[in-house]
Regions:
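Short helix-loop-beta junction
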Residues: 123-131
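Gly/Thr-rich phosphate-binding beta-strand-loop-beta motif of the actin/hexokinase/Hsp70
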Residues: 1-25, 39
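Gly/Ser/Thr-rich loops at beta-strand to alpha-helix junctions
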Residues: 9-13, 29, 111-115
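Adenine-nucleotide phosphate-binding core of ATP-dependent small-molecule kinases
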Residues: 58-104, 144
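Glycine-rich phosphate-binding/hydrolytic loop that grips phosphoryl groups
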Residues: 135-166
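Residue-level signature of catalytic and energy-coupling elements of molecular machines
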Residues: 39, 107, 151
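Glycine-rich phosphate-binding loop plus the immediately following alpha-helix
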Residues: 19-66
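Glycine-rich phosphate-binding loops at beta-strand->alpha-helix junctions
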Residues: 97-124, 139-143
Length: 166
């Protein structure tokens, strides 16, 4: 049981599962690439220059004395987080999910790599006052490999079930 977010380059995938059964899942066709393109347009730089700078230097904990690049990336990270969490709130309200215990939230994906991402994400979760209680909010131990590892585990479980039926 938990709430998982995968912040990838091309999209954000979200799944709320209760006892291993997906309750709410959705994808948003925005991710790190979208942030890079928007920031590049805002500061008049190439997307590759923005991406390289972001991957090497971005610190989302820094909030003052920002360069134009830092300002643009900071703004578009906040826009993406608000968009994702706002969509989650809408989905939760539609599904009328009721859970007895606070949900653990796990975040993965390359877009979540910058220092300060988790804090910004937690702030977005608080701003939207979701209709469920959240517990620990944390980064996955291997941001870039967690989704692949989960898919492998699911495939192994499926194969095991098939073999048991035979």
């Amino acid at each position: 049981t938990g709430l998982a977010f995968s912040f990838g380059g091309g999209m954000v995938n979200v799944c709320l599962a209760n006892l291993s059964i997906p309750v709410t899942t959705f994808s948003i066709a925005r991710g790190g690439d979208w942030i890079d393109k928007q920031a590049a347009r805002a500061v008049g730089e190439s997307v590759s220059a923005v991406t390289g700078w972001k991957e090497s230097y971005l610190d989302l904990d820094k909030r003052e004395n920002l360069s134009r690049m830092e300002q643009a990336l900071s703004i578009y990270y906040d826009i993406l987080l608000d968009y994702v969490v706002g969509h989650l709130k809408t989905e939760l309200e539609k599904s009328a999910v009721h859970l007895e215990n606070p949900l653990t939230v796990v975040v993965s994906g390359g877009t979540a790599k910058p220092t300060g991402f988790l804090k910004r994400f937690q702030e977005a979760l608080q701003r939207f006052q979701l209709p469920i209680e959240l517990g620990e909010v944390r980064l996955a131990p291997q941001l870039l490999h967690s989704v692949t590892k989960g898919a492998l585990i699911a495939a192994i479980v499926d194969e095991s079930k098939k073999q048991q039926k035979e």
